[in-house]
Amino acid sequence: MRLFLLLPALSLAAASCSMQPTPSSLSGSWTQPVPGQPGHVQGMQLLPDGRARSINMRTLLYRSWQLDGKRLTLTGKSIGNGNSSLFTTTSTIDRLSRTTLILNRDGNREAYTR
């Protein structure tokens, strides 16, 4: 009988920790620690209108974002060594909560917090 009552409670708890990716659930600032620089963060700001901005990244300038199911596509401009190029990256959203975003691109997982 206890197991019968426990299963719905566990299901509800698991569902509350995870969100479906929607433009409104993704909008906001997402950051991660800068490797080798304790106390510094970098990341992206996803605006509700589909524009994107980089946070503390001078050579990687995000311009826009798009959501297709669980796939997040970011576009922008990469600047370095006197050259610049446009880029598009698509990642799978492995996990999304109010405070955590985990992206997977080609097996490389990146964790962000809000």
Feature locations, PLM:
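Sec-dependent bacterial lipoprotein signal peptides
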Residues: 1-15
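Lipid interaction determinants
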Residues: 15-114
